[in-house]
């Protein structure tokens, strides 16, 4: 059975992961699509370092597609509602998230 990759869409039609991918530099975007293709071809058989279960009890059903290009690290968060379907929820650059968390802390 073929694996299916779906991009979550908000009610207004926006797709956070698609928008994230479009904002990446061309070479980084190509690497991201290559990793997505790996997931599509290998499904649940794909293991670390390409994919990893998100840690924490409240994130029990979430996985991350791990994308590394040179010193840039990105993640796409997804879940698997049925055996061969992967729904992409959110994409981010890892360094960017660290910066945001730091900037939210009060001095």
Predicted regions and their residues:
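Conserved catalytic cores of phosphodiester-cleaving nucleases, focusing on short active-site segments
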Residues: 89
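Basic, Lys/Arg-enriched alpha-helical interface segments
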Residues: 1-73, 82-85, 93-107
């Amino acid at each position: 059975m073929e694996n299916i990759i779906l991009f979550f869409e908000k009610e207004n039609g926006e797709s956070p992961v698609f928008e994230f991918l479009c904002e990446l530099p061309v070479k980084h975007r190509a690497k991201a699509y290559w990793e997505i293709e790996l997931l599509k071809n290998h499904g649940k058989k794909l293991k670390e370092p390409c994919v990893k279960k998100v840690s924490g009890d409240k994130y029990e059903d979430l996985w991350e597609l791990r994308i590394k290009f040179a010193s840039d690290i990105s993640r796409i968060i997804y879940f698997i509602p049925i055996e061969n379907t992967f729904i992409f929820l959110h994409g981010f650059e890892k360094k960017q998230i660290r910066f945001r968390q730091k900037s939210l802390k009060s001095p």
